[in-house]
Amino acid sequence: MASRAAPVRQTCCCFNIRVATIALAIYHIVMSVLLFIEHVVEVARGKVSCRFFKMPYLRMADLLSSFLLIGVLFIISISLLFGVVKNREKYLIPFLSLQIMDFLLCLLTLLGSYIELPAYLKLARPRPGPSKVPLMTLQLLDFCLSILTLCSSYMEVPTYLNFKSMNHMNYLPSQEGVPHSQFINMMLIFSVAFITVLILKVYMFKCVYTCYKFLKHMNSAMEDSSSKMFLKVALPSYEEALSLPPKTPEGDPAPPPYSEV
């Protein structure tokens, strides 16, 4: 008997959910590698502002916890890719939890930006200094990396790692004495852009959750079909059945023979 459960859709906004989820997993794997490289560069150049300056072991523990966080994010992304490729829905649960937490943090960031944006526009100043790489190239790389981080589920990770170059507020212009009308326009642009990012995160969560339901439905259907398969037994022929001895329960008398009426 076929399952009566409603079939799960294999598309999400005109995209195949498996392809979209695999692309999302690869995207976050690349982001994990970029975060690792960025953090290694920051540590090597001595630009990581550690909270424990006078305690070497605490400073080392802080750095190790940062690398451990990046490693956990990498494992979660690998788990997502492995679960989709191998059709195992339980490996998608860690990434779903990460997406929910990231969405809530992004929502709080959007609400808190209305408080911290005026202070940012007032205090942010360009930092002059010699550099071997052209300044515009560094700004472009920082901008691209900030946008990639903003659109992923790792948005709040740079805040923990103290990445000043990847702060989500960096793409806003930094100047003092902003007129009121210009400030309103900047806040409007910032709000629209951030709400667009939140909608993108909801869409990514929908893709992963739909893929999770699809894999779970497919695996349950396979288990039901395998459990309903009956064993085929070769029955004896009529002559073989007559030649077999009669089977009577032990201790019970045999049934009376048939007699003509």
Swiss-Prot record:
Entry keyword set: Lysosome, Membrane, Phosphoprotein, Transmembrane, Transmembrane helix, Transport
GO MF assignments: enzyme binding; protein sequestering activity; ubiquitin protein ligase binding
PANTHER family listed in its UniProt record: LYSOSOMAL-ASSOCIATED TRANSMEMBRANE PROTEIN, LYSOSOMAL-ASSOCIATED TRANSMEMBRANE PROTEIN 5
Stretches with biased composition (Pro residues): 246-261
Family: Belongs to the LAPTM4/LAPTM5 transporter family.
Name of the protein described by the UniProt record: Lysosomal-associated transmembrane protein 5
Species whose genome carries this gene: Mus musculus
Tissue-specificity statement: Preferentially expressed in adult hematopoietic tissues. High levels in lymphoid and myeloid tissues.
Described function: May have a special functional role during embryogenesis and in adult hematopoietic cells.
Cellular component terms per the entry's GO annotation: cytosol; lysosomal membrane; lysosome; perinuclear region of cytoplasm; plasma membrane; protein-containing complex; transport vesicle
Pfam families reported for this sequence: Mtp
Subunit comment: Binds to ubiquitin.
Superkingdom classification of source: Eukaryota
Transmembrane segments: 21-41, 65-85, 92-112, 133-153, 183-203
Induction profile: By retinoic acid. Likely target of the activated retinoic acid receptor alpha.
Modified residues (Phosphotyrosine): 258
Region span, Disordered: 242-261
Membrane topology, from the record: Multi-pass membrane protein
Compartment(s) where it occurs, according to its Swiss-Prot or TrEMBL record: Lysosome membrane
GO biological processes: cellular response to leukemia inhibitory factor; defense response to tumor cell; Golgi to lysosome transport; induction of programmed cell death; intracellular protein transport; intrinsic apoptotic signaling pathway; negative regulation of activated T cell proliferation; negative regulation of autophagic cell death
